[in-house]
Amino acid sequence: MTSCQFSSVEASGSGTVKTLMSDLPKDPRYQFTYRVAEFLNDALYDRYQHDDGTLFRRLMSYHETLSESEEISFVPFCGNHVEILNVDIPEPCVVNYGEEFMNESFYEIDGEKAVAAEAIQIFESFLDLFPLEIADGRGFIESDFRYMKDRRIPVIMGSEYKELFETGDIFEGYYLFERVSFEVIGIAKSGNTFYHPAVGPALYDRYIIMPFERVTNDSPFSRLQLLQETCGFIISENGWETAVSQIQQSLTDSGLADWRDQIVVNTRTIR
């Protein structure tokens, strides 16, 4: 399964900072926006990871079918953390910040100091729904979303990182169990808000913002990444039933009918 979850939280925050629903941008689409998450059981997940590539191709077909729907708009999102190596990051950016088990986010990987850092993975459509202003550097461009093996992953750093990183800086870490290099292309302005399915409204400030890179060739990494992309948001002006129907029909049409009860649409909108 992916790390995507639902939460009934209406507000979230750390320290004295509290982010409320009212801090989200004023977008009428929010009243039609539902959260989507993947809950593959162990048997289906194991089959997906270890088959001959048939399920990977079917899942690609599902995404293509869903993107062509005229009834809904699907906005992929996931919140997998990044394991940063040999860098002391700001405390608010650490996974489990403010919790009694925050110390579990610090460890070693093959003898190197590592820390679990908050991160999100998105497409352009997410930034259309939850805009992000850039203080320094640039935002994402189309080529940032193309998967290129062994290239540095372009990232935008939340404003908490502004004293630590500059545009052009490179750092090492692990993402989806692979060691990768990250290149800072921008630093975000402070105070921009988005909706995190697992925690509710949140500030971009403490997150590493990563592009979902569009995968086409089957590989262990591609399978994990494509599965992450089943999570996110559905905008359905015709209501929850239409959102569910579109997902289930797309799964059936793509040969994934046995996943129909594993991709879940929350009954509540985010607004």
Where are the regions a protein language model picked out?
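Hydrophobic secondary-structure segments that place a key small or acidic residue at a functional site
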Residues: 111-208
